[in-house]
């Protein structure tokens, strides 16, 4: 039996557990756990046993909490409603919207959370005040902050106590354009990075503003995992969510800034490696000499291991700065499996119709391992080659039923997801996908689901591009 693991389950599970701690109170929660373990040592228990102890120590009835948090789907959106008088808050309401998925949900959950006010002091963005409160229903007043001076940043779910989509007001967005990297607390920064990414994906923040915020704070970020994720998000923002009329300018801005950061990164460190990867993903034609220089070993301290050499080589190949013969020369230095996989990706990324046809035929007709298939997919579908890839829209749809019917699930599902012409973000692609689904509504449910998810990615990108117009 095939199933898809829902990654959100892990994130939501951790956040909901944290919300339970906040809802009952940390000390009450710990006391309840002590009682629970003492009472039920060496016995089997149920959720009800734990809830009884939590209710006893906290004084809160938890059955309604369990019903809404553990037995309903979707995530609520929380946004501020603010009124200012004499430069002070006369009104701060938290507006809660039901989940957009499942469609038709009216679920409004109780949240125990904090709202924080942050001020610019010197070069830093510092928390002035953070008040906890119970949020319920469609609107909740934050009474504890009324009369406070206007802050530079107002953050709902300060300290990450609940599970919700959070929105920022315009003043807070403008503050982040210059000061997201000036927040010393790593948790607060991570929260804000997640919030602006979600706002971008939901077309509530333009790609132009998102990129400005990201570039202002990226160099100051101290968590290498966050930097890695931000690099991926920056590429997606430029290539998928930016309005086409803004894309080239934003790519130039991003790549120049990343190169500046790379020049300042500590030699031989993890951040230098990661900024090199980000630079290679965004490099413009004007910067190809700089990238070639890096490949030639002219960036102080950078370790050019096999992975890094191939990453840079393939970035140059993708942009027409290196040829197939250069790929062969690189492979001759190391014929390991990792090198062969990178070589296969490079061949598929050559910006010619002939190279794309060869890669497509390998994906469609040849029996190749999943590892090689993934690399060829990756090389074939390059956002820098949009015009070249237009020719493969119709063949994709023409081969859907045959690939699904004759290939293994692993191969057929990767074809549906990875060969979908995602570089062609347009209403025409959405319409073409909808038309295929309508005409083939008796096709396998798994195929239709995967295709619908791919289409929804384009719908999301179109909305983001419209926001960036």
Q: What spans do the regions from the language model cover?
A:
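Non-catalytic accessory/interaction domains
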Residues: 6-8, 13-19, 23, 27-30, ...
